[in-house]
Design a protein with these regions (language model features):
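Short amphipathic beta-strand starts and helix->beta connectors
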Residues: 14-23, 64-73, 119-135
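Extended, positively charged loop/linker patches that create polyanion-binding surfaces
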Residues: 71-73, 80-120
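Ordered, amphipathic secondary-structure segments that act as subunit-interaction surfaces
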Residues: 30-85
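Short, charge-patterned binding micro-sites
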Residues: 6-39
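Core RNA-modification/binding signature centered on pseudouridine synthases
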Residues: 103-204
Length: 204
């Protein structure tokens, strides 16, 4: 793409590029973000044009934004949420009335699962990390906590939901699409999620 990307200093220079929240294996997305440092200013639409001219099939850069100096790393550390659309594959839809069950499940005061860590397993209440949840045609939409502080996988939510419904899913019963990644610009008392794109601005 011939972008003037900046490199780190030292014996093993590398491009100053990082992803906001790496996508899990087997999950597709329409809302991924990465941060790169350029050695010189460029128009944001030109960045998009150059990247898409050399992009691999199946991937497209939708927009580019300039984040003021000193705030790029902060922007990445602000990652706090993500939207996911879980859709059951054809013939894999369980006998669950999603329109009825999903709101009741989301209204539960506590949702405990056995969560595996590197050293052990422990009972964890994941309800505080489920920000929103709605039934969709042949699936479930959810907004979950994402980031370094608390990172909840949609697979765990579906596992807990189906167990609560008394249903056991076969392997590869659904697909997962991540639609958006958010930053939290609120306070400790009140969460305020905005798309990462909103942290920057276009350069013309």
């Amino acid at each position: 793409a011939e972008l003037p990307i900046a490199y780190s200093e030292g014996f093993s220079p590398h491009m100053l590029l990082s992803f906001a929240s790496p996508l899990g294996v087997g999950i597709s997305s329409t809302g991924e973000y990465f941060d790169m440092v350029l050695a010189e200013d460029m128009k944001t639409d030109e960045i998009v044009k150059r990247l898409n001219a050399t992009m691999v099939e199946g991937m497209e850069v939708l927009s580019a934004r300039h984040v003021p100096d000193g705030k790029a790393s902060k922007a990445m550390s602000l990652v706090a949420g993500a939207d996911y659309l879980v859709q059951f594959r054809e013939g894999k839809m369980p006998e669950i009335d999603l329109e009825t069950k999903v709101p009741v499940f989301f209204a539960l005061p506590q949702i405990e699962i056995m969560r595996k860590t590197k050293r052990s397993e422990k009972l964890t209440d994941i309800r505080p990390w489920i920000y929103d949840m709605k039934a969709k045609k042949s699936g479930v939409w959810m907004q979950l906590s994402t980031g370094s502080v608390s990172n909840l996988k949609p697979e765990l939510v579906m596992e807990a939901f189906c167990k609560w419904c008394g249903v056991e899913l076969p392997p590869f019963a659904y697909t997962i699409l991540r639609e958006e990644v958010y930053a939290d610009i609120g306070t400790e008392e009140e969460r305020k999620l905005v798309p990462l794109e909103a942290l920057g601005e276009e350069v013309e």
